[in-house]
């Protein structure tokens, strides 16, 4: 059995990123990460999203946004992890578990957070 390992990565620029929604943030980071691994989006077997406090996004299942941001991943199984300060670690652990068990061969792990909501509508 091969041990799972990280073979590609990317990150966004740091800052408030007010002009980007979650889909744009996912696309702008996931595509370079996949390319960094020498893969195409269609090579991915499972998507693991670490996203704490989805209430800011007004979207409870943010793992589905990966398929909207990257159409080639639309039918790829995706799950969202939420574990307070360890949310990103939980997403990595879940991907490593799926890889190590042989359930999948290639995983995409996305960690994201946007802690700002739009204007209140009354």
Predicted regions and their residues:
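Conserved beta-loop-alpha segment that forms the PLP phosphate-binding cup at the N-terminus of a helix
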Residues: 87-94
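Phosphate-binding/catalytic loop of phosphoryl-transfer enzymes
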Residues: 106
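Active-site nucleophile and cofactor-binding loops and adjacent substrate-binding regions
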Residues: 78-87
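Conserved "HGTGT" condensation-loop signature of ketosynthase/thiolase-family condensing enzymes
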Residues: 1-78, 97-101, 109-121
């Amino acid at each position: 059995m091969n041990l799972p390992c990280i073979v590609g990565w990317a990150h966004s620029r740091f800052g408030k990123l007010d002009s980007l929604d979650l889909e744009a943030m996912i696309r702008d980071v996931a595509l370079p990460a996949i390319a960094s691994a020498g893969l195409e989006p269609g090579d991915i077997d499972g998507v693991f999203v670490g996203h704490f406090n989805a209430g800011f996004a007004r979207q409870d299942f943010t793992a589905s946004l990966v398929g909207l941001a990257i159409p080639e991943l639309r039918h790829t199984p995706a799950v969202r992890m939420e574990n307070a300060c360890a949310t990103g670690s939980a997403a990595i652990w879940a991907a490593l578990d799926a890889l190590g068990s042989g359930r999948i061969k290639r995983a995409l792990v996305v960690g994201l957070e946007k802690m700002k909501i739009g204007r209140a509508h009354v």
